Amino acid sequence: MAEEIVIDKTLFFNRLSSFYAAWRADKRSSHPTFGGVGSIVILMGKTDEASTFQKNNAMHFWLLGYEFPATLLVFTLEAVYVVTTAKKAKHLEPLRGGKIPVEILITTKDPEGKLRSFEKCIEVIRSAGNKVGVLPKDTTTGPFAEDWKRTFAMLSAEIEEVDISPALSAAFAVKDTDELVSIRNASRACSGLMSEYFVEEMSRLLDEEKQMTHKALSARVDAKIDDAKFFNKLGKLPAEFDAQQIDWAYGPVIQSGGKYDLRLTAVSDNSNLEPGIIIAGFGIRYKTYSSMIARTYLVDPSKSQETNYAFLLALHEAVMRDVRDGTIAKDLYNKAINLIRTKKPELESHFVKSVGAGIGIELRDPNMVLNGKNSRTLKSGMTLSITVGLTDVEDPELKGSKSSTYSMIITDTVRVGENGPHVFTKDAGLDMDSVSFYFGDEEEPQKPIKEKKEAKTSAIASRNITRTKLRAERPTQINEGAEARRREHQKELAAKKTREGLDRFAGTTGDDNGVTQKKFKRFESYKRDNQLPTKVRELTIYVDQKASTVIVPIMGRPVPFHINTIKNASKSDEGEYAYLRINFLSPGQGVGRKDDQPFEDLSAHFLRNLTLRSKDNERLAQVAQDITELRKNALRREQEKKEMEDVVEQDKLIEIRNRRPVKLPDVYLRPPLDGKRVPGEVEIHQNGLRYMSPFRNEHVDVLFSNVKHLFFQPCAHELIVLIHVHLKTPIMIGKRKTRDVQFYREATEMQFDETGNRRRKHRYGDEEEFEAEQEERRRRAALDREFKAFAEKIADAGKDEGVDVDIPFREIGFTGVPNRSNVLIQPTTDALVQLTEPPFLVITLNEIEIAHLERVQFGLKNFDLVFVFKDFHRAPVHINTIPVESLEGVKDWLDSVDIAFTEGPLNLNWTTIMKTVVSDPYGFFADGGWSFLAAESDSEDGSEEEEESAFELSESELAAADESSEDDSEFDDDASAEASDFSAEEESGEDWDELERKAKKKDREGGLDDEEHGKKRKR
């Protein structure tokens, strides 16, 4: 049991006292409900997630507010006895010492101890009388329940068992204020979901003539219960309503098209939703208390259907009028039957067998069914579900069609009042105007024209990009018309980027020199003199590690220097003396970026350095080492602090308490938790995911509100199947900061040599290998289904936060080097990703400002791709060494997702470029923006009109940029080697045509001919 469990002691004793008062009064009654029992046994076995609420767990919730599995309650008029485990017993301890004694008997794994507790309970039952109240219809299972049943059967032969469920039904029937509020809130949630969501979805589907099965529509309604925002917006629900406390009591069930089942056990089938009679019903539970609602909707109804629904409304009103204090339950049913016999006797056989039942913790109280035999009297404060319905009525106007048979139902949840009912579900209209829809006479609505972008994206996504070594077959030989369209589209995108940049940065001045100005951070070594260490009295140099301070004696006084003011310290020897030189930070030193820091007052006088002399060589060497170490530690702490700046503390994960969370077992986590690599399991909770490690109860929580992207990558062509979560803000996993959390399972089993296996003697050839391959394919397909289904469940649970599953398009992927190794990079709908091996790459497409293709020139086998982000302070991302065969595919994809791109023959120094952009972004866009990147590619294509470049580089600057890019860029050494090979070829004097002829000749000699392919691309 969870630690948060707190039992309301006052409520427990109030309800127990009222129960005991009714029990004592019943002993004097001429019509005993309790059957003359001297004791009552309530047995709870193993909890079953699928089981409905019955009298035994209803008793637990009514008295304790919680369900205690594997627990025995024995009630006598003198005391209550509880048999349970020690863990559960500690939650029941506060109940001791009340006005009714509560004795707790603790069981352990020791069978003898459990037997002693059971024997004591049986002795108590015997001493209370020869009749004991039990619940024979409740199905309890589990070892604890079986042990009790076996022991009781052996030791209680002379004790008579009496069904106590009518007495419990009477005790639960009249609700107190808290119970009524919970049922009212559940009812308002039902009404809101029916009228504000289901009706809208149903009418939209019918209006747009979309096909959807009952099961699929039910699943949509089912998922809506997790939408806290939806329920919080419902006007009738109070401000204190907690949307996390609602759950399904039954359903939702949606039926149409001639097949109807009005029982609570009905389920939605796989038939499509059809016009005509549509029935929808469901029940919602709030704080364990239920409410239910059902409505019949008439879509283009026939006259017969309209007439019968109007009559059903009259029946409903007639029953409702008599729902008041003092009415006999069977009179409600008889009134409806009498009205049918008077008005429409042909419908008597089609009328439902009861007009409702008691409702509360149990969805349907079997001891309070409103049929023609129930003689119980209604009392003010009772809650009922009132149901009127007609089943399998033949429509004479639709004879021969599958919709000729129809059913109708109306269900409301009500409270019995002194003078009439209080209808809790009245906000979902049931009059003819509210439930009738007419689409038949309307004109067919025009279908909206889909945007061109969507079609283009899907076309690109479904196309395979062929890779081949033959030049004439490469995608560089592209359709001229397509290239012209792409070039035109790119010009539009470039102009749009410039306009957006001017609008975005209008009135801004940018950062000074392209660097965000750092703020001066104050530091203080000591607040008072008495905080100085005692060793300063010796007037020696002292390094105070605790205060991060170096204390230097100057003119007989200890002077502290905080380590943040010190640049470095060094020791040198000269003759018999050793010299310690301490250099301080001051403005204008021309130090590197790492040491760059702001100063409070640049006009102040600064101390540049101190030199101290001593004959104690070892002492000064130690001091120099201590200062260096202190400085190193200070820088490390500062760096760690800077790294952790964007780590935001997450909210608490809200765990699912009332049912088992959906789990994905046997998955590994990346980045892994510290320690041994073992598989754990992922659980879906109310507001996030939890990865549970089997060791040390470690876990990692990921909240839906922090999920930026959710990816599912199948195991096709891969060794693993995975679900990857890319976060908005980083979290800590162990001691690592990460923005990416991945759950994966290996898709291949360990291979082993079967030599010596007896099966080998009887099977030869490739049969075993073929079977193994078939099994491997089946297993991979099953893995993909399992992980995809789990990813979709994550998306459903997190849909309020906009979580959606994205799957990479492998067919339009390309290889490249984003970090150290060559990997497959794949586009998705919203991102460009590499998820197979760490470090992962996730680039969100809508955050990209522009893409630039580097080293695009004839003779090179690969090129580089640089993404510049809309946040100019973010470093551009490089993907290097992409094969030139992928060039056209990459361009097509960039164009299809509306990313402006340019290309050029060189690697650029992006650090310098971004400093220029950030220093004056408005000026940058006013001077043409990114057009300087396109200048090279435009001239290469032979364009007559050249735009003036906003970022002109001289030859020396280009050379410098090329040199510096070797340090800045992360592509491998092949690129520069290939560039030098090309320049050597150029010097030989062979032109393009000569090179092409030689290449074709070489291809033909290898048995290949490319004469059938299209013309060469003009340069």
Curated annotation (Swiss-Prot):
<dbReference type="InterPro" id="IPR048969">
    <property type="entry name" value="FACT_SPT16_C"/>
</dbReference>
<feature type="coiled-coil region">
    <location>
        <begin position="614"/>
        <end position="650"/>
    </location>
</feature>
<dbReference type="InterPro" id="IPR029149">
    <property type="entry name" value="Creatin/AminoP/Spt16_N"/>
</dbReference>
<keyword id="KW-0175">Coiled coil</keyword>
<protein>
    <recommendedName>
        <fullName>FACT complex subunit spt16</fullName>
    </recommendedName>
</protein>
<dbReference type="GO" id="GO:0140713">
    <property type="term" value="F:histone chaperone activity"/>
</dbReference>
<keyword id="KW-0539">Nucleus</keyword>
<keyword id="KW-0235">DNA replication</keyword>
<dbReference type="GO" id="GO:0045899">
    <property type="term" value="P:positive regulation of RNA polymerase II transcription preinitiation complex assembly"/>
</dbReference>
<feature type="compositionally biased region" description="Low complexity">
    <location>
        <begin position="951"/>
        <end position="962"/>
    </location>
</feature>
<dbReference type="GO" id="GO:0140719">
    <property type="term" value="P:constitutive heterochromatin formation"/>
</dbReference>
<dbReference type="InterPro" id="IPR013719">
    <property type="entry name" value="RTT106/SPT16-like_middle_dom"/>
</dbReference>
<comment type="similarity">
    <text>Belongs to the peptidase M24 family. SPT16 subfamily.</text>
</comment>
<dbReference type="Pfam" id="PF00557">
    <property type="entry name" value="Peptidase_M24"/>
</dbReference>
<feature type="compositionally biased region" description="Acidic residues">
    <location>
        <begin position="983"/>
        <end position="994"/>
    </location>
</feature>
<keyword id="KW-0158">Chromosome</keyword>
<dbReference type="InterPro" id="IPR011993">
    <property type="entry name" value="PH-like_dom_sf"/>
</dbReference>
<dbReference type="InterPro" id="IPR029148">
    <property type="entry name" value="FACT-SPT16_Nlobe"/>
</dbReference>
<dbReference type="InterPro" id="IPR000994">
    <property type="entry name" value="Pept_M24"/>
</dbReference>
<dbReference type="GO" id="GO:0031491">
    <property type="term" value="F:nucleosome binding"/>
</dbReference>
<dbReference type="InterPro" id="IPR040258">
    <property type="entry name" value="Spt16"/>
</dbReference>
<dbReference type="GO" id="GO:0007063">
    <property type="term" value="P:regulation of sister chromatid cohesion"/>
</dbReference>
<dbReference type="Pfam" id="PF08512">
    <property type="entry name" value="Rttp106-like_middle"/>
</dbReference>
<dbReference type="GO" id="GO:0006261">
    <property type="term" value="P:DNA-templated DNA replication"/>
</dbReference>
<dbReference type="GO" id="GO:0035101">
    <property type="term" value="C:FACT complex"/>
</dbReference>
<dbReference type="Pfam" id="PF14826">
    <property type="entry name" value="FACT-Spt16_Nlob"/>
</dbReference>
<dbReference type="GO" id="GO:0006281">
    <property type="term" value="P:DNA repair"/>
</dbReference>
<feature type="region of interest" description="Disordered">
    <location>
        <begin position="935"/>
        <end position="1019"/>
    </location>
</feature>
<dbReference type="GO" id="GO:0006368">
    <property type="term" value="P:transcription elongation by RNA polymerase II"/>
</dbReference>
<dbReference type="InterPro" id="IPR036005">
    <property type="entry name" value="Creatinase/aminopeptidase-like"/>
</dbReference>
<dbReference type="InterPro" id="IPR056595">
    <property type="entry name" value="Fact-SPT16_PH"/>
</dbReference>
<dbReference type="InterPro" id="IPR033825">
    <property type="entry name" value="Spt16_M24"/>
</dbReference>
<keyword id="KW-0234">DNA repair</keyword>
<feature type="coiled-coil region">
    <location>
        <begin position="476"/>
        <end position="500"/>
    </location>
</feature>
<dbReference type="Pfam" id="PF24824">
    <property type="entry name" value="PH_SPT16"/>
</dbReference>
<feature type="compositionally biased region" description="Acidic residues">
    <location>
        <begin position="937"/>
        <end position="950"/>
    </location>
</feature>
<dbReference type="InterPro" id="IPR013953">
    <property type="entry name" value="FACT_SPT16_M"/>
</dbReference>
<dbReference type="Pfam" id="PF21091">
    <property type="entry name" value="SPT16_C"/>
</dbReference>
<keyword id="KW-0805">Transcription regulation</keyword>
<comment type="subunit">
    <text>Forms a stable heterodimer with pob3. The spt16-pob3 dimer weakly associates with multiple molecules of nhp6 to form the FACT complex.</text>
</comment>
<keyword id="KW-0227">DNA damage</keyword>
<feature type="region of interest" description="Disordered">
    <location>
        <begin position="754"/>
        <end position="773"/>
    </location>
</feature>
